[in-house]
Structures are given as C-alpha cells and as structure tokens.
C-alpha cells in the first residue's frame, strides 16, 4: 500500500477566453495535445462526467475509466459508474493504489472540474492561444492559489490548428 494518497490532478485544455468545449467537442484540433493527454493519463484512473464520456464515445484503453452521473440507468461500457464525486474519488483511489500510481486524473467536464477543484493539487493545463466560440467554460483560477512549475510552448503545425502551451500548475 502506498503511504501517500494519490494526488488529484485536473487535465484540461482551455482557450484564452476560458473556453473548453462547443457542442460536446473541443473547439479546436490539436493532435499534439491528444498525444500529451494520452501520455500523462496512461495507466492512471481517469474520472469524468457522463457528457465527457459520451463525447469520447468509449472508455479509453489503458486506464481505469470512472464515470460520474446522477442517472442511475446510464451505462458506460468499459467504465465504472459512480453516482457522486465522493464515490468516484473513492473508486479512483482504490484503482490508483492497485495500479501503484500517484495521480487520479480528472478529465472533465465543466461541472466535474468545478466540483473537484477545491480538492485538486495539480492541473495539467493546455493553454490554447485562441479565443474560439464555445458553450462550455473552465472555472476562473485564483492565481494566489496556484504556481506554475512547468511550461512548454508550441507553434501551430500541420495537425495543430493554433499555438499552444503545456503548463503544469501546483497548488501553493
């Protein structure tokens, strides 16, 4: 058993206007971000809301998928269902302990991010340097509560619509 409980980490791609979604999808295309997401979440439990699961279309391989929903009839093939954040995090902690990993990855959506933010210790943030139309937004962070510990800037490319930065924030 790992004596240190796993860190709760948010994984979010956010535009300059705090946009994170449009019509259940990302409002941009960044292949590099998809590869980064896969790299940082692989082997770790991922927790998401029902709408995020539906937008993915399937459970993501190589990770324990936990879906939060109040709809007790909803079925997410290949995922563990949880009907509260507390239940979902308890399942994620067990999965992290069994896998020997030190992070629980929260991957969305808007309501899940907002609810879990007070418990989060780390944020893997992809800053998308654009301001697209959106209908889903990320919570405004209090800059006094977070410090940047990593930044890697990228120019747009053939499979990346916009310039972007990979940023890691740690709670102060």
Please provide the spans of the model-predicted regions:
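Flexible, gly/pro- and Lys/Arg-enriched active-site loops
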Residues: 3-7, 11-172
């Amino acid at each position: 058993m790992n004596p240190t409980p796993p860190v709760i980490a948010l994984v979010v791609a956010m535009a300059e206007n705090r946009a994170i979604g449009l019509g259940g999808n990302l409002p941009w295309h960044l292949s590099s971000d998809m590869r980064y997401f896969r790299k940082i979440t692989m082997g770790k439990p991922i927790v998401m809301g029902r709408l995020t699961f539906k937008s993915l279309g399937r459970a993501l391989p190589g990770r324990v998928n936990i879906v939060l929903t109040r709809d007790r009839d909803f079925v997410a093939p290949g995922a563990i269902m949880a009907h509260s954040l507390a239940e979902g995090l308890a399942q994620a902690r067990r999965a992290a302990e069994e896998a020997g990993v030190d992070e629980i990855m929260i991957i969305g959506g808007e309501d899940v991010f907002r609810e879990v933010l007070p418990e989060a210790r780390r944020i893997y943030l992809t800053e998308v340097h654009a301001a697209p139309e959106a209908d889903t937004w990320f919570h405004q962070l209090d800059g006094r509560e977070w410090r940047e510990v990593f930044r890697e800037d990228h120019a747009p490319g053939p499979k990346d619509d916009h310039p972007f930065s990979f940023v890691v924030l740690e709670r102060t």
